[in-house]
Swiss-Prot record:
Originating organism: Lacticaseibacillus rhamnosus
Listed EC numbers: 6.3.5.2
All residue ranges annotated as the GMPS ATP-PPase domain in the record: 203-392
Stored PROSITE patterns: GATASE_TYPE_1, GMPS_ATP_PPASE
Listed name of the protein: GMP synthase [glutamine-hydrolyzing]
Pathway as given in its UniProt record: Purine metabolism; GMP biosynthesis; GMP from XMP (L-Gln route): step 1/1
Domain of life, source organism: Bacteria
Top EC class of this enzyme: ligase
GO CC terms: cytosol
Taxonomic path: Bacteria, Bacillati, Bacillota, Bacilli, Lactobacillales
Alphabetized HAMAP family for the sequence: GMP_synthase
Transmembrane segments: none
Subunit structure: Homodimer.
Length: 517
C-alpha cells in the first residue's frame, strides 16, 4: 500500500535500525488495528511531518551508537512533538542524542531477563506487575539518562532497563517488547499506542482489500498481468485478489518445476482454475530445473538458479502472449526483511525478491509485500477462498529444492515427497494441523548405518521440522506427543525407500530459520 492510500488511517511508523525483529514491531501495532509501516532511519523530519504519524518507534539494531558510521536520526524529529519509543538500540540512540551516556556493557545480555518496574506512575507499565520477564539482546547500555528523563525499570545487568520523559513523550526500553518472550510486551506496546499516542484503531483488512483493488486497477489500467502460481497460499491469494480486481486481464502461469509436494500440481489446477475460474497455463519445466540444479550444493546458488529459471520461463511464456506488461508475485513482508534491507544483515535471499535479473522485462506488482502470513490468510478468507486452501501449509518459492540439503536429484525429491506426505497425513489424523503453524520433512544428506530385517543398511536420515508461530518472524518447535512422533517415524522408515532413521528438529527461531536452507 502506498502512503497516499493510508491518509485515512492513524499510523505509527517504525524507523529501521537493522534489527531482524523490526518487522515484528509493525505487526504488533497492526494487531491493535493501527496501521504501521517500516521507514528508513534516514527519513527526514519534513518527511515524517508529511506522513503525520501518531507515534514513532526507533527499532533495535546490531550495531553500537559509537561505531564508525553508526546509524543516526534527523534530530529535528525530536522537535515535532510526536511521541517516540526507542527499543534497544533505539533507546540508546535516543539517550545519546539527547545528552545521556551509553557505554559497552560488562556482560552482554541475550535472552530472558528479569526487570523491576521502579516507578508505578510510568505510562508504559501502567497496571502491570512490578516484576516482569523480558527478552534482552544488547551489548551496550544507557549509563546516564538525559536531562528530563527518569529511570522506570531496572535489572541486575542493566540498571537502566527503561526510561521516559513524560513531558516530551519520549520513552525507551532496553528490551524487546515485540517478541513473545517478553511477558507483558503486548501491554507495553498497547500503552504506547493508545495511552501515549492516542491512536485510533481504524485500519482493517476490509479497507485493505478495497484500497488494494483500487490501486491495482489504477496501476494496471487496461494492460495484462502475468502471475506465477507456486501452489502455495501466498500466490493463490494474489491470484484471487488480482482476478477480483482485473478479471480476464490476468493470466496465471503454473510452473511444475518438479519441486512440488505430492499431488500438489493437481490440487492447484482443480482449486484455482476449476473453482475460481482463473486463466491458468500449466508449464512442465521439471527437466529444465533439475538439469540446472545438477551438481549445485550451495543453498544460495540453488535459490538464485530457481528464481532465475522462474523468470526465464515467464519471459518465454509471456513472449507467446500479447500485451503482458506486469508480473505479479506473492512477496510478503517477512520475505523482504529476511532478504535484508540497507540496515539489516541478510540472513538468506528469498525466491520472490532475490532471483530477479536486472533486465526484468516486466513491471512488478507485489500486493502482499506489506502483509504478514497471518494477515494473508485473513485476506484469503475475506476474499471467499475456502478454509482448506487458505490454511494450507506454507511452502517456499524454491519448493523442495531447499528441503533437499545439497544436490537435488529426482530420487532425493521422491524421498522428501513421500515422507512429507506421511507427516501431513499423520498430523491431520491426530487433529494437530490447526495447532502447528508449519510442518515438513527435510533430507539433510546424512546417511547412517541401520538394521532392517536381518540385514545391514546404510541409508538416509529424514528430519522433521514442526513449529508454532504467529507470523513466522519468531517460532518455537512444536511439542508433539511422543507416541505420535513414534507413529510418524515408524511409517516413514517402513514406507519410504532408502530411509532408516528419523530425527526431530527442536530448534527455535532464532537462532535457526524455519527452513533448513
Amino acid at each position: 500500500m502506498a502512503n497516499d492510500q493510508n491518509k485515512d488511517y492513524d499510523k505509527i511508523i517504525v524507523l529501521d535500525y537493522g534489527s531482524q525483529y523490526n518487522q515484528l514491531i509493525t505487526r504488533r501495532i497492526r494487531e491493535f488495528g493501527i496501521y504501521s509501516e517500516l521507514k528508513p532511519h534516514t527519513i527526514t523530519a519534513a518527511e515524517v511531518k508529511k506522513i503525520a504519524p501518531k507515534g514513532i518507534i526507533f527499532s533495535g539494531g546490531p550495531n553500537s551508537v559509537y561505531d564508525e558510521g553508526a546509524l543516526g536520526v534527523d534530530e529535528d524529529i525530536f522537535k515535532l512533538g510526536i511521541p517516540i519509543l526507542g527499543v534497544c538500540y533505539g533507546m540508546q540512540l535516543m539517550a545519546q542524542r539527547l545528552g545521556g551516556d551509553v557505554e559497552p556493557a560488562d556482560n552482554r545480555e541475550y535472552g530472558k531477563a528479569d526487570i523491576e518496574v521502579t516507578d508505578a506512575s510510568a505510562k508504559l507499565f501502567h497496571d502491570l506487575p512490578k516484576d516482569q520477564t523480558v527478552w534482552m539482546s544488547h551489548g551496550d547500555l544507557v549509563t546516564r539518562v538525559p536531562d528530563g528523563f527518569r529511570t522506570t525499570a531496572t535489572s541486575v545487568n542493566c540498571p537502566i532497563s527503561a526510561m521516559d520523559d513524560d513531558d516530551r513523550k519520549f520513552y525507551g526500553i532496553q528490551f524487546h517488547a515485540e517478541v513473545q518472550n517478553t511477558q507483558y510486551g503486548h501491554e507495553i506496546l498497547h500503552h504506547f499506542a493508545f495511552d501515549v499516542c492516542h491512536a485510533e484503531a481504524n485500519w482493517s483488512m476490509d479497507d485493505f482489500i478495497t484500497k488494494q483493488i483500487a490501486k491495482i486497477r489504477a496501476e494496471v489500467g487496461d494492460k495484462r498481468v502475468l502471475l506465477g502460481l507456486s501452489g502455495g497460499v501466498d500466490s493463490s491469494v494474489v491470484g484471487v485478489l488480482l482476478h477480483k480486481a482485473i478479471g480476464t486481464q490476468l493470466t496465471s502461469i503454473f510452473v511444475d518445476h518438479g519441486l512440488l509436494r505430492k499431488g500438489e500440481a493437481e490440487q492447484v489446477m482443480d482449486s484455482l482454475k476449476g473453482k475460481f475460474g482463473l486463466n491458468i497455463i500449466k508449464v512442465n519445466a521439471k527437466d529444465r530445473f533439475l538439469n540446472d540444479l545438477r551438481g549445485v550444493t550451495d543453498p544460495e546458488k540453488k535459490r538464485k538458479i530457481i528464481g532465475r529459471d522462474f523468470i526465464e520461463v515467464f519471459n518465454e511464456e509471456a513472449a507467446k502472449l500479447n500485451g503482458i506488461e506486469f508480473l505479479a508475485q506473492g512477496t510478503l513482508y517477512t520475505d523482504v526483511v529476511e532478504s535484508g534491507t540497507d540496515t539489516a544483515q541478510t540472513i538468506k535471499s528469498h525466491h520472490n525478491v532475490g532471483g530477479l535479473p536486472e533486465d526484468l522485462k516486466f513491471k512488478l506488482i507485489e500486493p502482499l509485500n506489506k502483509l504478514f502470513k497471518d494477515e494473508v490468510r485473513e485476506l484469503g478468507e475475506k476474499l471467499g477462498m475456502p478454509h482448506s486452501l487458505v490454511w494450507r501449509q506454507p511452502f517456499p518459492g524454491p519448493g523442495l529444492g531447499i528441503r533437499v540439503i545439497g544436490e537435488v536429484t529426482e530420487d532425493k525429491l521422491e524421498i522428501v515427497r513421500d515422507s512429507d506426505y506421511i507427516l501431513r497425513e499423520e498430523i491431520a489424523k491426530h487433529g494437530l494441523d490447526k495447532d502447528i503453524w508449519q510442518y515438513f520433512t527435510v533430507l539433510p544428506g546424512i546417511r547412517s548405518v541401520g538394521v532392517m530385517g536381518d540385514g545391514r543398511t546404510y541409508d538416509y536420515t529424514i528430519g522433521i521440522r514442526a513449529i508454532t508461530s504467529i507470523d513466522g518472524m519468531t517460532a518455537d518447535f512444536a511439542r508433539i506427543d511422543w507416541d505420535v512422533l513414534q507413529e510418524i517415524s515408524s511409517r516413514i522408515v517402513n514406507e519410504v525407500k532408502h530411509v532408516n532413521r528419523v530425527v526431530y528438529d527442536i530448534t527455535s527461531k532464532p537462532p535457526a530459520t524455519i527452513e533448513w536452507e
